[in-house]
Amino acid sequence: MHRKMAVKTLSVWLLLVGTLVPQHCCQHWSYGLSPGGKRQLDSLSQTLGNVVEEFPRVDSPCSVLGGAEESPFAGIYRMKGFLGSITDRGNRTQNI
C-alpha cells in the first residue's frame, strides 16, 4: 500500500516539475523582429545597445579563479562595437 502511494506521489511530482521547469528555463529575445523572424537592420544597433546596457560595467579583471586577466564583459563591449560598425556599413550600402 505504501509503495502505491509512493509511486503516485513521485508521478505527481515528476509531472509538476516536468511542466514547470521548461517554462522557466527558456528565454525569448524578440527585439526588432519582423514577421518571419527577420530583423530590420536599422534596429539591430539599437538592439545591441539595449542588450549590452543590461550588463554591469566591470573595470577590474575578474579574479574568482585566479587565472582571469580580462573582464568577462570586455569581449561583449568589443563585439558590440564590431557589430555596430557592420550594421552601419550595411545601412550605408543599402541607402546608396
From Swiss-Prot:
InterPro entries for this protein: GnRH, Gonadoliberin, Gonadoliberin_I_precursor
Modified residues (Pyrrolidone carboxylic acid): 27
Expressing tissues: Preoptic area of the brain.
Any one cellular-component term (Gene Ontology): extracellular space
Domain of life: Eukaryota
The UniProt record lists the keyword Secreted: yes
A molecular function (GO) term: gonadotropin hormone-releasing hormone activity
Membership in a protein family: Belongs to the GnRH family.
Known role: Stimulates the secretion of gonadotropins.
Protein name: Progonadoliberin-1
Native source organism of the sequence: Verasper moseri (Barfin flounder)
